[in-house]
């Protein structure tokens, strides 16, 4: 059987400039990000790994599904939080009973914060040049 036939649910997550497309497959709890194991891709950073696994752990499903993720754009922080949102959305597709738990843990909330653009006449987005009275 091909992986397309086994796929239980899809979810897309976004954060900053990162986009993560998440697929859930029945399995033992393995997480692959861009064809690499999650801990290798996330450089063994425990906070990123915890963010990725948190929707599964809050439902107690950490060893029920294999997670296959394709991510693009941004850095590891944005990608890991985009994966978290995509995974939570995919889990909601599997069973609607998961939705209230995920919502109460804020896994279904899209974090809209992004870098503010630089304005002309300023050094950065809000940093103005030094004021001189005379």
UniProtKB/Swiss-Prot annotation:
Keywords, comma-separated and alphabetical: Cyanelle, Plastid, Ribonucleoprotein, Ribosomal protein
The keyword Ribonucleoprotein is annotated on this UniProt entry:
yes
GO molecular function terms attached to this record: RNA binding; structural constituent of ribosome
Q: Where in the cell is it found?
A: Plastid, Cyanelle
Instruction: Return the Basic residues bias intervals.
Output: 115-134
- Bias category Basic and acidic residues: which stretches? 105-114
Per the record, the domain of life is: Eukaryota
Family statement drawn from the similarity comment of this UniProt entry:
Belongs to the universal ribosomal protein uS9 family.
- Designated name of the protein: Small ribosomal subunit protein uS9c
Native organism: Cyanophora paradoxa
């Amino acid at each position: 059987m091909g992986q397309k036939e086994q796929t239980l649910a899809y979810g897309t997550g976004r954060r900053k400039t990162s986009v993560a497309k998440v697929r859930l497959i029945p399995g033992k709890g393995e997480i692959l990000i861009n064809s690499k194991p999650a801990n290798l891709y996330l450089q063994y950073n425990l906070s990123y790994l915890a963010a990725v696994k948190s929707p599964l752990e809050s439902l107690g499903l950490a060893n029920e599904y294999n997670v296959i993720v394709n991510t693009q754009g941004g850095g590891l922080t944005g990608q890991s939080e985009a994966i978290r949102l995509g995974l939570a959305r995919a889990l909601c597709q599997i069973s609607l009973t998961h939705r209230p738990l995920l919502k109460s843990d804020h896994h279904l909330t899209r974090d809209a914060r992004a870098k503010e653009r630089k304005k002309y006449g300023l050094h950065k987005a809000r940093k103005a040049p030094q004021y001189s009275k005379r």
